[in-house]
C-alpha cells in the first residue's frame, strides 16, 4: 500500500540480546547491584571488589579477604580437612553440602589459620557466604572455637571477619549450641588479656550476630553491611512500627553505639595494623604477668 512507502524505516538492525551477551565472555564484566554501572571485572578486583563509581562493597570470598589483610605468604591454615556430616539426617542436606564444596572449593563456611599483619602474628577466621550462606553449623563453630583456643595458646590477637545468615537450620540445636561454645572460648581468651577484633561484613545476621560477632574488644564493619538478628519484616510486624530506611545498616549501628567504627575496605589492613600496634606492648605485659 502507498502508506507503507512513507513509514519511517529503522536505520539500524536490531541485534538480539542473546547475541550481545555472547560477544562478551562470562566473567569479563561485572554490574554493580547498587549503581548499575558495568565495569571490567579485572578493574573491580584490583580495587578490592569495591565499585569504582559508587563505593559499593561487593562480597569477598575467604581467600580474597585473607590476601587483602595478611602479609603475602604468611597464612597457615588450620583444620582444613574438617567437614560437616548430617547428624539429624536432614533430607537433602548432604547433597547441598557436596554441591557447595564443589562450587566454592571449600570444605566449610569458614577458613581459619594464622598469619601476620606487618609482621605481627594473629589468628584469623574468615567466613565465606558462598557456602550455605555462611551459616553456622557444628563444624563452623568448632573451627572458630579451636582458632580462638589457638590464639589463647599462642598469646596473640584473634580477628574474625563475619558474613553469615545465622545458625544452620539443618543441624537444629547442634548449630545453636555453637553460639555458646564460641562465646565461652572468647571469654577465656579475654580473661587472659587476649585481644579480639570482630569485623562484620555484609550480611552478618541471626545467631552469628547474636554471639561471637558482637563480642569484640573492637567491633568494626564495612560500609553498608547488613547487621542484625531478626529480619526487618519480622521486627516491623512485632513492634507494629515502620523502621527507618537505614535500619540494621553498619552506619545505623555506629550511630547507635553498637559499632566502634565503619571502615572502608581500602583502609581495613591499615586500621587493623594500628589497633594491633597499640595493643602490642600492653597485651604482652598482661600475658606475662
Curated annotation (Swiss-Prot):
This is Acetyl-coenzyme A carboxylase carboxyl transferase subunit beta. Gene3D superfamilies: 2-enoyl-CoA Hydratase, Chain A, domain 1 (3.90.226.10). Acetyl-CoA carboxylase is a heterohexamer composed of biotin carboxyl carrier protein (AccB), biotin carboxylase (AccC) and two subunits each of ACCase subunit alpha (AccA) and ACCase subunit beta (AccD). It is an enzyme of class 2 (transferase). It comes from Bacillus cereus (strain ATCC 14579 / DSM 31 / CCUG 7414 / JCM 2152 / NBRC 15305 / NCIMB 9373 / NCTC 2599 / NRRL B-3711). Disulfide bonds: none annotated. Keywords: ATP-binding, Cytoplasm, Fatty acid biosynthesis, Fatty acid metabolism, Lipid biosynthesis, Lipid metabolism, Metal-binding, Nucleotide-binding, Transferase, Zinc, Zinc-finger. One of its GO terms (molecular function) is ATP binding. Coiled coil: none annotated. Component of the acetyl coenzyme A carboxylase (ACC) complex. Biotin carboxylase (BC) catalyzes the carboxylation of biotin on its carrier protein (BCCP) and then the CO(2) group is transferred by the transcarboxylase to acetyl-CoA to form malonyl-CoA. Its cofactor is Zn(2+). It comes from the Bacteria. Zn(2+) binds at residues 32, 35, 51, 54. The gene is accD. Belongs to the AccD/PCCB family. A zinc finger (C4-type) spans 32-54.
